[in-house]
Amino acid sequence: MHALTGLSLVSLLSFGYLSWDWAKPSLVADGPGEPGLEQPSAPPPQPPHIIFILTDDQGYHDVGYHGSDIETPTLDRLAAEGVKLENYYIQPICTPSRSQLLTGRYQIHTGLQHSIIRPRQPNCLPLDQVTLPQKLQEAGYSTHMVGKWHLGFYRKECLPTRRGFDTFLGSLTGNVDYYTYDNCDGPGVCGFDLHEGENVAWGLSGQYSTMLYAQRVSHILASHSPRRPLFLYVAFQAVHTPLQSPREYLYRYRTMGNVARRKYAAMVTCMDEAVRNITSALKRYGFYNNSVIIFSSDNGGQTFSGGSNWPLRGRKGTYWEGGVRGLGFVHSPLLKRKRRTSRALVHITDWYPTLVGLAGGTASAADGLDGYDVWPAISEGRASPRTEILHNIDPLYNHARHGSLEAGFGIWNTAVQAAIRVGEWKLLTGDPGYGDWIPPQTLAAFPGSWWNLERMASARQAVWLFNISADPYEREDLAGQRPDVVRALLARLVDYNRTAIPVRYPAENPRAHPDFNGGAWGPWASDEEEEEEEEEAGRARSFSRGRRKKKCKICKLRSFFRKLNTRLMSQRI
């Protein structure tokens, strides 16, 4: 599945600007880090505690060490003392990143290729997938989740506590009020969404979510023995919309001209302080010296809601670098070479085998994983085993006006939205999303005409090719000059697509309305619907093995309406 090719990685300066004065193959180990104290005197007496912190919609430019105007002293310090991941990739929207983190598999192998899981959809992370916390439980870990789930909840079996977490406090949907925890999925379809375990946590309403989640992490640490390995998954709601922040954080950004940027900056700084409190609790309760802290964003910043991905192209929801290049670093006393920047190619699917390996377990491509164990690359500066990334193939998003099978050399329909990185080359087909280069927002009102101008500039294309090492800003399209590379990468897309399973994107169910669940979002599926879903999953597995069976007439009719509904919902998105 993974082609081994030469790869030149991207150099990222600590101020967030990408340099052009070097090219270094990915198969060469990183340069030396700070000597001396970086070598631990002895192996840890037990598997390390693992703390994975995931932020929501934090842009590439929205951290101090990338030259931002936002204050993030904690993140800056932790990154400086650890290993900055400056060739790190995530997915462009919420659900795909979270699903790949917890399964180690690309979207094409879980059926979540299209969009996100919406609150009223009978859909969730496939139940036949063994999740990262389940693997860590097998290794003797206590597992806890705090924050945003966004991987489906229509059945109780989909809930975090049924997918490997011993405890859970957070929201099930993708977007809630930071104080009231209300979420509206359309006019009049509103409900409360804060859960503790499998119960609605009505009594915790009114507390700002970033602070509430940090307090819960501290409580978990205070009540847990450092002698038992611990996995903490902290998925902050911050800094996703709505833009809400405690007043004391807003005051320090009162001179910012752009209101959205001002609120967003306050939220980022509040989140930074929450990370400081979590780190302090790790030290206070005796966990820190045997801990590995991973920090990651989930997708690019939403540029018209305060975020910034400058100087990268694009934003959240796009396959340009601004949508898929992630913020990431690892901080740990267990790192063998600290205080350095790693340019090893890393993808969010890699955390699954990497963390399972740290826990003493095994996980590899033989288990159907798309991720690699990148701990030697991170901790020791060795070469990354990864040489390519399938960003995605979305067969339902095939509306690019100028795409065709002919334009894809007869092997690929370029109207289909897809993106792949192989070595130093990146190929995009279909509609990758809005391709602006948007500077940090400083004006009181952002000129929306820039948006339309950029769209018009690329309106007649459906294939792009970039040398990401030489052109990290994606300004020079080489598709016309290098048809040989285009054809080779299209062939890789074809190879990947042969392994894809059908998309899971069902129609919304009216019974999911919170009014039928006491005013809160929560599981709603009946036993009959659960059986039907299991039958559908079985058909999907049979399809992926090439053994589709004939269906009865009513089944065909049902399938027709499902596909029709999917098309309509895709158009709506």
From Swiss-Prot:
- Extract one GO molecular function annotation from the record: sulfuric ester hydrolase activity
The source's superkingdom equals: Eukaryota
Q: What is its EC number?
A: 3.1.6.-
Q: Which Gene3D superfamilies match?
A: 3.30.1120.10, Alkaline Phosphatase, subunit A (3.40.720.10)
Q: What class of enzyme is it?
A: hydrolase
User: Which segments show compositional bias classed as Acidic residues?
Assistant: 526-536
Give the protein's recorded name: Arylsulfatase I
Organism of provenance: Canis lupus familiaris
Q: Where is the active site?
A: C94 (nucleophile), H150
Name a single GO cellular component.
Answer: endoplasmic reticulum
Pfam families the UniProt entry points to: Sulfatase
UniProt-annotated glycosylation sites, renumbered to this chain:
N277, N289, N467, N497
Cofactor notes: Binds 1 Ca(2+) ion per subunit.
Q: Does the keyword Disulfide bond apply?
A: no
Q: Modified after translation how?
A: The oxidation of Cys-94 residue to 3-oxoalanine (also known as C(alpha)-formylglycine) by SUMF1/Sulfatase-modifying factor 1, seems critical for catalytic activity.
